[in-house]
Amino acid sequence: MKSSLKPVEKYAYSIFEIAKEEKKLDLYKHNLETINSIIEEVPAFFEAVGDPARDRNERKQIVIKNLEGEIDIYLISLIDLLIDVKSVKLLKKIVLKALDFVNEALSVKKVLITTAYELTKNQIDRLLQSLKKKYVCEKIEPIVVVDKSIIGGLSINFESQVLDNSLKTKLFNIVKKVN
C-alpha cells in the first residue's frame, strides 16, 4: 500500500488486512456494519467518545463497557487509538472505507434502488434475484431509498449502470418529445 495514502485509507486498509490475515472477513463486515449503525442511530454515543472535554480513560471505558464482546478487539483498539490521537471524528469514514475493502474481497456488490414508496422484503428479494441472474453475481446488497419525487416506479443503479423506470423520467421523456 502506498505511503501517500490519507489516514482514513491507512486505518481502513489496516483493518482490512487484519480481517484478511485472521480469516475473519465476514465477522469484520458484520462488526463494521454494527459500528456504522451505532454511529448513525446513536450519534450521542460517539459524540461522548470523541468529546475532548471528557477524560481519555473515561472515553475508553465507555467503548469497552458498551462494545466489548460485541465487536472484535482490533476494532475496539482502533477506536482507542482514535481517542488517543483525537481523531474519533474519522471513525465513520474509516468504517465505510474498510467496508469497501471487505466487500470487494468478499465479492459483494451494492445496488441502489430508488422507489417512490417503501418496498416489502419480498419485493426486494425478487428484485435481487433478478439482478443476480442478469449480472451473474452471488452477493448483492441493496441500498433502498424512498424518494417521492420520482412519483412512481423505481430506479436501479448497479455498477455504474442505471435502469430508470421511474414515472418522473417517463413523463420527462414525453415532454421532451413533445417540445
UniProtKB/Swiss-Prot annotation:
Coiled coil: none annotated. InterPro entries: ATP_synth_OSCP/delta_N_sf (IPR026015), ATPase_OSCP/dsu (IPR000711). One of its GO terms (cellular component) is plasma membrane. F-type ATPases have 2 components, F(1) - the catalytic core - and F(0) - the membrane proton channel. F(1) has five subunits: alpha(3), beta(3), gamma(1), delta(1), epsilon(1). F(0) has three main subunits: a(1), b(2) and c(10-14). The alpha and beta chains form an alternating ring which encloses part of the gamma chain. F(1) is attached to F(0) by a central stalk formed by the gamma and epsilon chains, while a peripheral stalk is formed by the delta and b chains. SUPFAM superfamilies: N-terminal domain of the delta subunit of the F1F0-ATP synthase (SSF47928). Belongs to the ATPase delta chain family. This is ATP synthase subunit delta. It comes from the Bacteria. It is a peripheral membrane protein. Pfam families: OSCP (PF00213). One of its GO terms (molecular function) is proton-transporting ATP synthase activity, rotational mechanism. F(1)F(0) ATP synthase produces ATP from ADP in the presence of a proton or sodium gradient. F-type ATPases consist of two structural domains, F(1) containing the extramembraneous catalytic core and F(0) containing the membrane proton channel, linked together by a central stalk and a peripheral stalk. During catalysis, ATP synthesis in the catalytic domain of F(1) is coupled via a rotary mechanism of the central stalk subunits to proton translocation. This protein is part of the stalk that links CF(0) to CF(1). It either transmits conformational changes from CF(0) to CF(1) or is implicated in proton conduction. Keywords: ATP synthesis, Cell membrane, CF(1), Hydrogen ion transport, Ion transport, Membrane, Transport. The keyword Chaperone does not apply. The gene is atpH. Its main location: membrane. It is found in: Cell membrane. It comes from Ureaplasma parvum serovar 3 (strain ATCC 700970).
